[in-house]
Design a protein with these regions (language model features):
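Amphipathic alpha-helical repeat elements characteristic of tetratricopeptide repeat
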Residues: 57-64, 80-83, 153, 172
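Transmembrane signal-anchor/signal-peptide helices with a preference for the extracytoplasmic
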Residues: 44-68
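Soluble extracytoplasmic domains of inner/organellar membrane proteins
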Residues: 96, 102-103, 110-223
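N-terminal positive-inside, membrane-proximal cytosolic segments immediately preceding the first
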Residues: 2-43
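Short extracytoplasmic
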Residues: 67-100
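Flexible helix-coil transition and linker loops at the boundaries of alpha-helical arrays
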Residues: 54-55, 90-93, 127-130
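Acidic, proline/glycine-rich low-complexity intrinsically disordered segments
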Residues: 9-16, 72, 98, 127-128
Length: 223
């Protein structure tokens, strides 16, 4: 009886296993197309993503090469060529190289004597809120520093957002403001701004030396 019981148990196990297999086969037949489609979609997605990463890497390398080629032309004083390359990079890309290319484009135009174009290049940087505030402030300072066309009010207005904020470049902007006063022969304003800046405890040793030198020069000649 024990043997028969074991045989019956084995038979039930076999039948149960066969039923499971039949059910699995039926399920596979019913859903195989959907399952295969899902697997293919996953594979296609993975391949597409990897292809995108490879494309992106190659694109970044291409952009990088274009930027450094433009930079080399700028360093070699081939300003027309550097202007063309920087302009292409600035127009076609939206990553960090666009911002760097705008700085390079501004410098190329400045060296070519195209001050109006230079001003617009820097404006494109400081008007773009997606760019970090440090670089936007830096573009304002460089624009004022190199601008020999705009009025005093226009240049002073450009510096004002830096002067009124806790920017890392605030002290440098304050120093540039003094030079702006002197440039436009606003001597009393220059002297007042110079004394205020010299009294600040957060100016660097190098900047203090520069300011004291300016103070001595203009005190002996103008102030």
């Amino acid at each position: 009886m024990l043997i028969r019981g074991l045989d019956m148990a084995d038979i039930f196990d076999e039948v149960s296993e066969e039923l499971k297999q039949d059910k699995l086969i039926q399920t596979w037949k019913k859903y195989s197309k959907i399952i295969i489609t899902l697997i293919l979609l996953i594979i296609i997605s993975l391949v597409s993503y990897q292809s995108y990463l490879i494309w992106k890497k190659n694109k970044i390398e291409e952009i990088s090469e274009q930027y450094f080629e433009a930079l080399e032309k700028l360093e070699n004083k081939n300003y027309s060529k550097s202007q063309s390359l920087f302009l292409k990079n600035a127009q076609n890309h939206k990553n960090g190289y666009k911002m760097l290319s705008l700085f390079g484009l501004a410098e190329s135009n400045y060296q070519n004597g195209k001050i109006d174009e230079m001003i617009m290049n820097y404006k494109a940087i400081y008007d773009d809120e997606s760019i970090g505030i440090y670089y936007r402030d830096l573009s304002r300072i460089l624009s004022v520093l190199k601008d020999n066309l705009s009025s005093f009010d226009q240049q002073k207005l450009l510096l004002q957002p830096i002067l009124n904020s806790p920017s890392k470049l605030q002290i440098l902007a304050a120093e540039l403001e003094i030079l702006l006063f002197i440039k436009f022969k606003k001597i009393k304003e220059a002297e007042k701004a110079l004394n205020i800046l010299l009294d600040r405890s957060d100016i660097s040793f190098e900047q203090k030396n520069r300011l004291e030198l300016i103070n001595r020069i203009y005190k002996n000649n103008v102030f």
